Amino acid sequence: MFGSAHGDTTSSDTSGRRPLRLVVLPLLLALSSCKVDLYTQLQEREANEIVALLMDNGVDAVRVAGKDGTSTIQVDEKLLAFSIKLLNGKGLPRQSFKNLGEIFQGSGLIASPTEERARYVYALSEELSHTISDIDGVFSARVHVVLPHNDLLRAGDTPSSASVFIRHDAKTNLPALLPKIKMLVAESIEGLAYDKVEVVLVPVERSAQEQRSLLEPDLAQASRPIPVPLLAVAVGVGAAVFAVTCYLLFIVLGHRRRQLTGELSRVQERPGVSALAAIRKKIPALGRR
């Protein structure tokens, strides 16, 4: 009898582990929702802007803060290509610019006048490009500065000039700011005249999905599909609930079966007593059937 009881216990433990696996596996699948890194080493402000844009277009994006103060954007692996195209159309992440301090930091070597002049021109271009990129509606901007090396002893000097390239949202009335942009560039460079600044504006149309989300925000919100990670979590939770229910039912039936087995064993030890009759006494419902 002891051997039989030990065998029943071992079988019960082994069988009880299977429902536990059914509970744990869906939860693990739900928690590991196939998130991949979209962009890393981002500043917090730009990372929040990217997350807001992705979520407005139906992408479940997550910002993960790093120990160095930068942020990482994670999205579902299936939406990685769509997210990259969407952000590229918006000029995100923005190009990083160097400031004057980074360009002229001490290198320990004596630079030639030509090298110093090249650094100065490059620094002016970077600073102006960064400033223009901060204008609302501007996706990207580049400023090219030309500072000719004129001889003070010679007449007919070549004037300085600058060219500005701006890629912006077509919905933004950036042409209205054109005089101010030219004035900004002219006043930032010594010896540069206003009429020597040329600005090229390149408007970028919104995608059909973005236009629909802007014109019909309520409809877009109502018809937005459930993000894949949330759907995986819902399926995992439902499977976990079903597995727990099956596990509890399995325990109840196993306990009931062990009770009947114990009753049958005790009846078999009594001489002259019918096993079926003893069980019917214990379970009146079976006798009535």
From Swiss-Prot:
Protein name, entry field: Nodulation protein NolT
Pfam families in alphabetical order: YscJ_FliF (PF01514)
Chief subcellular location: membrane
Keywords, comma-separated and alphabetical: Cell outer membrane, Lipoprotein, Membrane, Nodulation, Palmitate, Plasmid, Signal, Transmembrane, Transmembrane helix
GO biological process: protein secretion
Family matches, as Gene3D superfamilies: 3.30.300.30, Hypothetical protein rpa1041
InterPro entries for the chain: AMP-bd_C_sf (IPR045851), FliF_N_dom (IPR006182), T3SS_SctJ (IPR003282), YscJ/FliF (IPR043427)
Role of this protein: Regulates cultivar-specific nodulation of soybean.
Membrane topology: Lipid-anchor
Covalent lipid adducts (S-diacylglycerol cysteine), residues: C34
Keyword Nucleotide-binding attached: no
Naturally occurring in which organism (per UniProt): Rhizobium fredii (Sinorhizobium fredii)
Family: Belongs to the YscJ lipoprotein family.
Transmembrane segments: 233-253
PANTHER family noted in UniProt: FLAGELLAR M-RING PROTEIN, YOP PROTEINS TRANSLOCATION LIPOPROTEIN J
Cellular component, GO annotation: cell outer membrane
Record's subcellular location: Cell outer membrane
